[in-house]
């Protein structure tokens, strides 16, 4: 997910998107435990995307409070 895509998301959509990515991460972790994942780099990219979205969510909350 690119920074531009993150900025284009509405603040109300951020928690939903974070939840979706966390579910994907959970599924990927479970598949990794069973040895079904070939692209292990996806775990890292999902974690980073979640962090980026959480950062954007925090920034939007601070902006709304100010």
UniProtKB/Swiss-Prot annotation:
A GO CC term attached to the entry: ribonucleoprotein complex
This protein's name: Large ribosomal subunit protein uL29
UniProt record, GO biological process: translation
Taxonomic source organism: Opitutus terrae (strain DSM 11246 / JCM 15787 / PB90-1)
Keyword Cytoplasm: no
Record-level Gene Ontology MF annotations: structural constituent of ribosome
Key words of the record: Ribonucleoprotein, Ribosomal protein
InterPro entries noted in UniProt: Ribosomal_uL29, Ribosomal_uL29_CS, Ribosomal_uL29_sf
Family membership: Belongs to the universal ribosomal protein uL29 family.
UniProt-listed PROSITE patterns: RIBOSOMAL_L29 (PS00579)
One Pfam assignment: Ribosomal_L29
Residue ranges the record marks as coiled coil: none
Lineage top rank: taxon: Bacteria
Transmembrane segments: none
